[in-house]
Structure formats: C-alpha cells, structure tokens
C-alpha cells in the first residue's frame, strides 16, 4: 500500500521545484556568483565540497538499509522499493539524454568565479544536475515505502543539491530541475511498474486457486 500523503507531496514538490527553476533562470549568473563565490571564501568551503562530492552516498546507504529491511520484513514494500529503483535508473537515464540534447555549459567553465570543486571536463554538461536527479529519486523511493524517513532523506537530498551549487559546478535551476526530474520519473515509473506486477501476480494466483480450477473445469 502506497502512503496517500506521498503522492500529493511529490506532486507539490515537482511543481515547486519547477517554479524555482523557472524563477531563478533569468538571474542564474548573479546567483551563481553570490552562492559559489561566497562558499569558496567561507570557512565551510570544505564541508560544501564534501557534501557536493560524497553526500549522495548517505542516501544510497539509507536506501540499501531499506532494501534489506523490506526484504526480510515486508515483501510487498520490497517490491515497491524495487520498482522505485527501476524508476531511479530511468530518471538518471532521462537526465543523461536531456544533458546531451541541451548541452548547457557548466557555470564554472564560462564564469570567472573561484569554486570549491574543480570544474568537470568539457562535454560534462550542466542541465539538469545528475547528482540532484539521483538525490530526488532516492529520496522519493525511500518515502514510498517509509514516509516517516522524510525528516532524514528530504534534507539530505536538498543538501546535496544545494552543495552542488555552493561548490561551483551547477546553477540553481540545474539542481532544482534535477530534483524535480528525479521525483517525477521515479514516482511515475515506480508506481506504474509496481501496480502492473501486482495485477499480474493476482491474476496468476487466482488461476491457480482451487476455486478457479473448479470454475474452469481444470
């Protein structure tokens, strides 16, 4: 059973993040200079770089723990988490395709702002942010099976996205779009795949039941 509160929350998040991306697009350069430049001069520059580079691992660990827990305790929720995992892969693939189509250069490559992290090589495009896409996808995958974890996974996803801007490798609209993409695709694919598997399983079970065999004469 999918928690009812998750779907409206996910939709609201997608709409809010999309609006944030649209609003910040016109001021992307000044925002980048303020955030990335300020972070590079801040005593917290090292922390921003660490979260930007390795913060995604925390969400991976939480998701892995949920995989083990649901496999042992609740196979139905494990199935939903597995379907959401497929959605995460689809979200990442979509992000990569969009990157290649749009080919937006990294802000650290076109600007003159000192950044916390080294700028990725040419051809490693900026929009949307892959890290943010995966962060949003993993967060919503966890929330589909364990909504009480929102106080942990939502701040983590936002921290990863924000740190990518602070570290100087993305614009604000890059990470907002990435989060929205990860949440939307993972939610849609995960729920659709899980619902499809459940329908097939129910049909298969009903055909093998004694009542069904007596009805069909088998």
Residue spans for each PLM region:
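N-terminal transmembrane-helix/juxtamembrane module of multi-pass inner/ER membrane proteins
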Residues: 1-63, 95-121, 205-208, 213-218
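Aromatic-anchored segments of alpha-helical transmembrane domains
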Residues: 17-23, 88-94, 157-169
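Alpha-helical membrane-inserting segments
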Residues: 28, 44, 90, 94, ...
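Membrane-helix interface segments
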Residues: 43, 75-80, 108, 146-152
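Hydrophobic alpha-helical transmembrane segments
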Residues: 52-71, 131-134, 142-143
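Interfacial segments of alpha-helical transmembrane regions
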Residues: 63-94
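Hydrophobic alpha-helical transmembrane segments of integral membrane proteins
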Residues: 85-107, 166-187
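Membrane-embedded catalytic cores of phosphoryl/pyrophosphoryl-handling enzymes
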Residues: 118-218
């Amino acid at each position: 059973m999918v928690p009812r509160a998750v779907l409206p929350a996910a939709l609201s998040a997608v709409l809010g993040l999309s609006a944030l991306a649209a609003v910040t697009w016109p001021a992307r350069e000044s925002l980048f200079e303020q955030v990335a430049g300020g972070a590079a001069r801040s005593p917290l520059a090292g922390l921003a770089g660490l979260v930007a580079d390795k913060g995604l691992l925390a969400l991976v660990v939480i998701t892995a723990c949920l995989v083990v827990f649901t496999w042992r305790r609740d196979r139905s929720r494990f199935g939903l988490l597995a379907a959401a995992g497929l959605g995460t892969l689809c979200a990442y693939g979509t992000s990569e395709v969009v990157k290649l189509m749009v080919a937006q250069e990294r802000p650290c490559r076109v600007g003159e702002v000192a950044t916390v992290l080294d700028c990725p090589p040419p051809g490693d495009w900026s929009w949307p942010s892959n890290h943010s896409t995966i962060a949003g996808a993993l967060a919503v995958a966890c929330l589909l099976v364990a909504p009480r974890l929102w106080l942990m996974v939502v701040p983590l996803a936002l921290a990863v996205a924000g740190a990518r801007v602070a570290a100087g490798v993305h614009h604000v609209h890059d990470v907002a779009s990435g989060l929205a993409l990860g949440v939307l695709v993972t939610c849609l694919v995960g729920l659709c795949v899980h619902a499809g598997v459940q329908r097939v399983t129910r049909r298969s079970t009903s055909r093998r039941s004694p009542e069904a065999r007596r009805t069909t004469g088998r």
